[in-house]
Amino acid sequence: MIEGLSHMTFIVRDLERMTRILEGVFDAREVYASDTEQFSLSREKFFLIGDIWVAIMQGEKLAERSYNHIAFKIDDADFDRYAERVGKLGLDMRPPRPRVEGEGRSIYFYDDDNHMFELHTGTLTERLARKAKGLEAAQ
C-alpha cells in the first residue's frame, strides 16, 4: 500500500546554485551533503521543505522545458513575497495561465536546469468546488 510521497529528486548542473534556489525560495533546510563521498550515482544533497524530502544530484540539465512541474502550496497573503524571492534569484518567471476566480493564484518559474516549479495559493477542495460551480452554471 502506498503510504505517501517519499521524496523528489532533481538532476542539476550546479548543486550550490540549486541550494541557493531551494533555500531562497522555499526556505529549504539542508540535511545532508555527500561532498567528496559518493554513495549514489553522483554528488548529492538532501533538503527538507516543510516535511517534504527533496534531493538534488549533480548531472546534466533537462534538454528542454515542459509544463511538467511540482506545485507547492503557499498562503495568498504571501504571494507577493514569494514572487519577489523568485525575481531576486533571477529565475525565469512565467506569466500565469488564465484561471477562473476561485482557483487560486500561481507563480510559475523555471530553475537553471529547466525544471518548472509552481507556487500556488489554492487547494484541491477549492478547485473541485469551483469546477462544480461551473458545471451547475452550464446546466
From Swiss-Prot:
Signal peptide: none annotated. GO terms for molecular function: metal ion binding. Keywords: Antibiotic resistance, Cytoplasm, Manganese, Metal-binding. InterPro entries: Fosfomycin_Res_Enzymes, FosX, Glyas_Bleomycin-R_OHBP_Dase, Glyas_Fos-R_dOase_dom, VOC. Mn(2+) binds at H7, H69, E118. PROSITE patterns: VOC. Its main location: cytoplasm. This is Fosfomycin resistance protein FosX. Catalyzes the hydration of fosfomycin. Residues 4-122 form the VOC domain. The active site is at E44 (proton acceptor). GO terms for cellular component: cytoplasm. The gene is fosX. The keyword Manganese applies. It comes from the Bacteria. Its cofactor is Mn(2+). It holds the Pfam family Glyoxalase. One of its GO terms (biological process) is response to antibiotic. The keyword Metal-binding applies. Belongs to the fosfomycin resistance protein family. Homodimer. The lineage of its organism: Bacteria, Pseudomonadati, Pseudomonadota, Alphaproteobacteria, Hyphomicrobiales. It is found in: Cytoplasm. It comes from Mesorhizobium japonicum (strain LMG 29417 / CECT 9101 / MAFF 303099) (Mesorhizobium loti (strain MAFF 303099)).
